[in-house]
Amino acid sequence: MADTARARRLAKRIAQIVASGLEYEVKDPRLAMVTITDARVTPDLRDATVYYTVFGDDADHASTAAALASATGVLRSRVGQQTGVRFTPTLTFVADTVPDDARRLDELLAQAREADAEVARLASTAEHAGDADPYRVDTEDDDDDTDGADAEARSDADVRRGPQSG
């Protein structure tokens, strides 16, 4: 089993070799707008996954995938010559979705900022609902001769027993 540090170093070197191979050796015009973003190697150093991005629309993505599939043999032999490992890893090219995900997150954050600004704008012009004092205030009746002790005892009893009809 290989060292994970060695696998990381080999992956970094494979990404460099593939990027320079696409720039200088492979002369396919469909690969003009390709950027190699990352490479990952399995711990046994037999398989490498190379991640790439393409500037363009979906048709450009499809044509780039086909061009990379046709250039895999040339790039693999170049990797084998320049790395010096016993077994040259097989290359698999995968479109990198990180830029698309980042763009989508930026859009969602912008929508959240707009919603927050709208809430802040509505809150600045909002008024309180109801009275200034939203809590119920007991009013004292002027015709009641008691000091309010009976009303207070009655309200405490109502709270304990619950409301009664009649």
Swiss-Prot record:
Pfam families reported for this sequence: RBFA
Region (Disordered): 122-166
Biased composition (Acidic residues): 139-150
A molecular function (GO) term: ribosomal small subunit binding
Record keywords: Cytoplasm, Ribosome biogenesis
Biased composition (Basic and acidic residues): 128-138, 151-166
Protein name stated in the entry: Ribosome-binding factor A
Species this chain originates from: Saccharopolyspora erythraea (strain ATCC 11635 / DSM 40517 / JCM 4748 / NBRC 13426 / NCIMB 8594 / NRRL 2338)
Taxonomic placement: Bacteria, Bacillati, Actinomycetota, Actinomycetes, Pseudonocardiales
